[in-house]
């Protein structure tokens, strides 16, 4: 018996990286999973992986989280396919890279807020009627140590992720009487963003791993996923409004690397 048997989760950006790892950890504990992903091949692959690896019920729903109607359809897919929704994980992100603050454009900054803040806002609003039904409602939003520490040349990412963290805390305060727990994970793991950095600058990626107190970058399934599964289950029923740094201790000294920019 898994800790999430009978529960239903929606995970955005579940086709790869941290989102895929979280989807796997939830499925491993017995949850049915809606794999919300813009990349059809990646999303289909993740859903099949969940079925093959853990015998999970998994449904791929192609979702552009910057499109409100698609976000609403994603939430509806959970109840249409599985009859309920207990867990909402807002993870999707696709940024525009590094830039000095003075070179950041209005369009790129807005795009970051659409991807992180508006997407989660729409999903949380739409999901609330289901989340509050059974006392099992959980919202898990993925934010970043980079935002907390104001990492250089990452204004789009930092501002959007910190706004999402405040949105989460506000929801935690307002929805606590409804027994809907809302928490943040700030992961240090092999995300797609990390993979792109590693491909572009292997030396920087090696330095990032070396700077971590544990000497490595976390694994999405085995390091981040179990924390998400804990937050999704009954053991976290008295935990809300928190930010969990799941990063091998990286938050102790802060971000120790800086990207190269023009």
Task: Please annotate each region the language model reported.
Residues 177, 184, 203-239, 246-248:
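C-terminal helical subdomain
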Residues 102-121, 136, 140, 157, ...:
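Catalytic Tyr-X3-Lys loop
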Residues 144:
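Residue(s) in the substrate-gating loop at a strand-loop-helix junction
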Residues 124, 160, 168:
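Active-site helix of classical SDR
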Residues 98, 240-262:
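Short C-terminal tail/terminal secondary-structure segment
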């Amino acid at each position: 018996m898994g800790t999430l048997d009978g529960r239903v989760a929606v995970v955005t950006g579940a086709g790869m990286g941290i989102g895929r790892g979280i989807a796997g950890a939830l499925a491993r504990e017995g949850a049915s999973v809606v794999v919300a992903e813009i990349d059809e091949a990646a999303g289909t692959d993740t859903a099949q992986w969940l079925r093959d690896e853990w015998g999970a019920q998994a449904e791929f729903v192609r979702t552009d989280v910057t499109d409100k109607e698609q976000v609403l359809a994603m939430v509806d897919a959970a109840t249409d396919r599985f009859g309920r929704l207990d867990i909402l994980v807002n993870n999707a992100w696709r940024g525009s890279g590094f830039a000095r603050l003075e070179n950041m454009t209005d369009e790129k900054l807005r795009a970051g807020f659409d991807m992180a803040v508006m997407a989660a806002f729409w999903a949380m609003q739409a999901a609330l009627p289901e989340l509050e039904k059974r006392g099992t409602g959980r919202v898990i939003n993925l934010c970043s140590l980079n935002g907390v520490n104001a990492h250089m040349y990452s204004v789009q990412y930092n501002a959007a992720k910190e706004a999402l963290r405040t949105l989460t805390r506000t929801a935690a305060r307002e929805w606590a009487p409804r027994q809907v727990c809302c928490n943040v994970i700030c992961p240090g793991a092999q995300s797609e963003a990390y993979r792109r950095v590693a491909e572009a600058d292997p030396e920087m990626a090696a330095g990032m791993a070396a700077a971590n107190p544990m000497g490595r970058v976390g694994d999405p399934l085995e390091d981040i996923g179990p924390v998400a599964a804990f937050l999704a289950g009954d053991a976290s029923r008295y935990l809300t409004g928190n930010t969990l740094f799941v990063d091998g201790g990286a938050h102790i000294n802060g971000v120790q690397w800086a990207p190269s920019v023009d």
